[in-house]
Amino acid sequence: MITTTLCYIEKDGKYLMLHRVKKHNDINEGKWIGVGGHAENQETPEECLVREVKEETGLTLTSYRFRGLVTFISNECEPELMCVFTADGFTGELIECDEGELAWVDKEEVPELPTWEGDRVFLNLLLSGEERFFSIKLKYEGLSLIHISEPTRHSLI
């Protein structure tokens, strides 16, 4: 199982979103996603998060929260465990991203963007105001979402 991170960076009621329009043969082509990527050898999720955000945006995170785990199962690729974060503190200025166009989008409008169907599921969990950690499994067949597990919530002390 591969490990990835995804972060929704917040500022003034908006999330920083990445419109994937620059890479060829990109499974995310044309979609809007948060910032993140694959963990490198021996990286913790937090190390991966900070590195990926810096590489893709130029920003250095100063305040972030681990919000949930998403297990992706697909008949076309290796299973993925995605660590979902939100961040509300950062330093630096946005840079040009070689994977797509970065844009600040009103949080309420994000689920209406062209995203993966499963992304809308966990985006709605984040936007619900519920603060507890979540875990959910999303199963895809090709590009179609065929199963969504009931999200579990955990209080972390």
Where are these regions (language model features)?
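Conserved N-terminal beta-strand and adjoining loop/helix that marks the start
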Residues: M1-M17, H38
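Conserved Nudix-box catalytic region and its N-terminal flanking loop in Nudix hydrolases
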Residues: L16-R51, S149
